[in-house]
Amino acid sequence: NGNLIQIIENPQSDILGENYVFSPLKVAVDYADRIYVIAQNQFEGIMAFDAEGNFTGFTGTINVQITTAEIIWRKLSTKAQRAKQQLFIPTEFTGMEIDSDGFVYATNVDAEGEQSVRRLNPSGEDVIQKGAAGVSGDILWRLTGDYSGASRIIDVVVREKGIYSVIDSTRGRIFTYDHEGNLLYIFGGIGSQEGTFDTPTAIDTIGDEIIVLDGSKNLVDKYRATNYGFLINQAVGLRYDGDEASAVECWKQVLKLDSNFELAYVGIGKSYLAAGENKKAMECFKTGNNRQYYSIAYKRYRNEILKENLTGYLTAALVLIILLVLWNKIGKKKWKERRASHV
């Protein structure tokens, strides 16, 4: 009932250093009461504490990748030039949430727009599925002008059936993905009209509704799914539970509202693939622009055709062999008869 159990402050560890100042920004707790903290100016990763509040180390450190060109340039540049160059230090996390399996979904700012969301297993390894276009918000953006640059993903909320949503503070948009990293839908934006944000700072859910905190407007916006969004969520959830047949019916309803929604065709195609209807699956994957599953369906369909016609091919080959044997025997017999007539 809101009783204070424990206060965690100033964790002590050799890896933190003597003068470390603990400035927690965000906190999350998993099913085993392990505590995860994003702390200010903490680049080593997310701080982890056990159920008793003891600091146990870091998880999910983001290693900065240095390209070969950057390494060569740093070797060739002068000391003054190197001093002006950006330091290659790990990136801070900006938001996190823990799913029902104990995996930590964490967001970070990535200027390149390549990976702004991670799903960390208990070992701290990123096991997130990125889909065809990644899970970092916008895949195309302007380099100059207002709202330029990659999406700045600052927070994440985990929803039901493997669905999760992230919020971009650059353009104020919310991106929702399924557990495979497929983009489901986008909404929101920067503006003054209803349904837009000034400075979105956090995202969460209450039941089936999404709530977003706006730091400048000092208010909380609440969103409820439209029929279109509801059908997509339902289709993804049914497939997540293994109910492919029911998911197909939902995808068909989605296509009535948006005939260009590629993921719906892919969802229907996967159902056909599971049912062994490979030709129909190929058609759906082609329309859904999914080369990976199209190749799988094509190989299965090719094997299916070969198997169906194998008996015919073997029969034709057997008949041909018999004819060749008979022809050979008849030819030998005639040759012997001619030879005997000449003697």
Language-model-derived ranges and their functions:
Residues 1-278, 285-289, 295-343:
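Eukaryotic scaffold repeat domains enriched in small/polar residues
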